[in-house]
Curated annotation (Swiss-Prot):
GO terms for cellular component: cytoplasm. It comes from Alteromonas mediterranea (strain DSM 17117 / CIP 110805 / LMG 28347 / Deep ecotype). Its main location: cytoplasm. SUPFAM superfamilies: S-adenosyl-L-methionine-dependent methyltransferases. S-adenosyl-L-methionine binds at residues 193, 226-229, 245, 265, 282. This is Ribosomal RNA large subunit methyltransferase M.
Length: 365
């Protein structure tokens, strides 16, 4: 059957926050609809009133420019009573009933929610992909060879009985299956929190920005550094780090000669040489306090760039992020410099979002 909506994959428990973000951002852009979400389902829908706006809506902003969605899929068909006997045939029949959004797709992903229930679908989805891909190619829906430069077809099984059919565009979608970038924990890191910063560096900064922000020989400050998970990522890239925490920093980091440990309050500490290239912060504090502190460092040029986490409350999480970032952005907008700002709820984040702020000149924007 026909279904016109934006399907957003998200962390379980964040469905309502994801729905609030979609409603706010699409509504402000004039793409009107209504959200549907179920707690702990791992996804949310934004149903459009005007089906003709589907492609225009999904290109309104890329998934990496959103906060809570891991993937944004433009859904144009759904099957609410999938039968075991001929699932491939049912998908093909559903596609025959709708207008083809593109002449051909370059790839297909068969996906499922990132939940305990979703994991029971994982094996089936992997096995189902091969015969489905073959049938789609035979029916003229897929290129003979995978072409990731073309739109991708997504078959999302919410359960064994319900699946949604949609597409993503390569310029606006996550490249990762389920929208999840899985990273391997480095055995020599003192803390699993290191994956949060690595996730941000890999997925929120372009290669050019990484070279600019993480230059070997540069200086950084890590507020709330103990035991050194974030410092580890900076040292690994050859940066000198002022690690600020009343707790101890791992001996393995101190022995590199790149780390200075200062037992001090993160809110009152100032850089040893007046400024640093990068400020990072994963302190457990109120969102508005962290946003103000980060603003102070950037406005007063104590730091050129910043990467930090904002811890989230149990309720009004989207609104909390917007309020904190609106306040911070207003301070940055008053400066002569320009800033590339991103806010993401990364896979390795829990009840927090990660913010990257890269300073540029006005001419670079």
């Amino acid at each position: 059957m026909s279904d016109t909506s934006i399907l957003a994959y998200c962390r379980p428990g964040y469905e309502n926050d994801t729905a609030n973000e979609l409603t706010s951002r699409y509504g402000e852009a004039g793409f009107y609809g209504y959200p549907v979400s179920k707690k702990n389902s791992g996804f949310a829908h934004y149903h459009l009133y005007d089906a003709a706006q589907l492609e225009q809506t999904v290109t309104q902003f890329a998934v990496h420019d959103s906060i809570f969605p891991r993937q944004l899929v433009a859904v144009f068909a759904a099957i609410n009573d999938v039968e075991k006997e001929d699932r491939v045939g049912q998908v093909l029949d559903a596609l025959k009933e709708v207008e083809k959004p593109f002449s051909i797709f370059g790839a297909v992903d068969v996906e499922y929610p990132d939940t305990e229930e979703g994991k029971t679908l994982a094996k089936f989805c992997r096995k189902f992909t091969v015969p489905l891909r073959q049938a789609l190619r035979k029916a003229g829906w897929l290129t003979a060879k995978e072409n990731l430069g073309k739109p991708k077809l997504h078959i999302f099984f919410a359960s064994f009985e319900i699946c949604y059919i949609g597409f993503t565009l390569p310029s606006h979608a996550s490249r990762d299956h389920l929208g999840i970038c899985r990273l391997k924990f480095p055995s020599d890191s003192p803390s699993r929190s290191t994956l949060k910063l690595e996730d941000a560096l890999v997925n929120m900064l372009s290669n050019k920005q990484q070279s600019k922000v993480l230059r070997s020989g540069g200086r950084a400050v890590d507020l709330g550094a103990c035991p050194g998970g974030w410092t580890y990522q900076l040292v690994k890239r050859g940066m000198y780090v002022e690690a600020i925490d009343n707790g101890l920093i791992a001996d393995s980091l101190m022995s590199t000669g790149l780390v200075e440990h200062h037992a001090a309050d993160g809110f009152t500490y100032r850089p040893q040489f007046g400024r640093v290239d990068l400020l990072v912060c994963d302190m457990i504090e109120q969102p508005d306090r962290v946003a103000k502190l980060m603003g102070d460092w950037l406005v007063k040029h104590w730091a050129t760039h910043a990467i930090f986490n904002i811890k989230l409350p149990m309720k009004r999480r989207y609104e909390t992020v917007v309020e904190a970032m609106t306040s911070l952005n207003s301070r940055l907008d008053a400066l002569d410099d320009a800033f590339a700002v991103k806010v993401r709820h990364l896979y390795h984040d829990r009840d927090e979002v990660t913010v990257t702020i890269v300073r540029t000149s006005k001419d670079e924007v």
